[in-house]
C-alpha cells in the first residue's frame, strides 16, 4: 500500500467514525516532483494544491488536463494573472484589491474560478487572512455579486493541536462565519481546514477540505 492509499484510507475511516462525509483531499504538491504527482494521479488523486503561482503554472501545463488546481498560498498582486490562468480554486482571498484584479483578469480570459475567503482566526501576524467581521462581510458581498468568482466558503490556518476549549471556540467561529455567508446568499459552504497533523480535529468541527502534502508525497525536493 502506498503512502497516498494509506492516508486516504485513514481519512475515510476517520470521517466515518465521526459520522461525517469524507472531505475533499487536496494533495499539496508544493516543491514535489512531477514524478511523484503522476504516481498519486494514477492512484486516483485529481485535486492538487500549490502555494506559488509560477510553480502552479509550470505543473498545470505538464500534468493531465483533468487535474483540478487549488491555489492555497498568499496572494501577490503581480501573480494574480497567473492564478487566473491556471487555478480552478483560490483558497486565500482576503483583499478587495486582489479580488478586483482577479475579476479583471478572468474577464480577459473568459474564465471563472471558485473562491474561499481566508480568515486569520488566531490573528497571527505571520499569516494572511481577514481578522475583522466587517472586512469579511464587505469582501463576501463583493464576491457574491461577481459573475467570474464563485464564493464557496472559507479557509483557515489555525495553530496546531488546540485544546478542547480552543477547538470549541474555533467550531463556534466556523459556525458564525457560515451563518454570515448564508445570510448573503452563499449556501453549502466549503470549509478548507486541516492538514495531516490535525485532520481529525478539523473533521470534528466541520472541515470539508483537507490539505495534505508530505504525508502522501514524502519529503519535498
PLM region descriptions:
Residues 91, 207-221:
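Gly/Pro- and small hydrophobic-enriched strand-loop and loop-to-helix capping segments
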Residues 1-197, 203-205:
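Conserved alpha/beta-domain cores
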Amino acid at each position: 500500500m502506498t503512502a497516498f492509499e494509506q492516508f486516504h484510507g485513514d481519512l475515510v475511516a476517520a470521517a466515518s467514525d465521526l459520522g461525517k462525509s469524507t472531505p475533499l483531499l487536496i494533495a499539496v504538491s508544493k516543491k514535489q516532483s512531477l514524478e511523484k504527482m503522476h504516481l498519486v494521479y494514477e492512484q486516483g488523486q485529481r485535486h492538487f494544491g500549490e502555494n506559488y503561482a509560477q510553480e502552479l503554472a509550470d505543473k498545470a501545463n505538464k500534468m493531465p488536463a483533468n487535474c483540478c488546481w487549488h491555489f492555497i498560498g498568499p496572494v501577490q498582486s503581480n501573480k494574480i494573472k497567473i492564478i487566473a490562468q491556471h487555478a480552478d480554486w483560490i483558497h486565500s482571498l482576503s483583499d478587495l484589491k486582489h479580488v478586483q484584479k482577479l475579476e479583471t483578469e478572468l474577464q480577459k480570459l473568459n474564465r471563472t474560478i471558485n473562491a474561499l475567503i481566508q480568515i486569520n482566526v488566531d490573528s497571527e501576524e505571520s499569516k494572511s487572512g481577514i481578522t475583522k467581521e466587517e472586512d469579511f462581510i464587505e469582501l463576501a458581498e463583493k464576491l457574491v455579486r461577481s459573475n467570474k468568482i464563485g464564493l464557496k466558503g472559507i479557509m483557515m490556518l489555525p495553530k496546531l493541536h488546540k485544546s478542547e476549549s480552543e477547538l470549541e471556540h474555533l467550531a463556534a467561529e466556523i459556525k458564525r462565519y457560515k451563518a454570515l455567508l448564508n445570510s448573503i446568499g452563499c449556501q453549502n459552504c466549503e470549509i478548507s481546514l486541516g492538514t495531516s497533523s490535525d485532520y481529525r480535529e478539523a473533521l470534528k468541527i466541520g472541515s470539508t477540505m483537507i490539505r495534505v502534502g508530505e504525508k502522501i508525497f514524502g519529503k519535498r525536493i
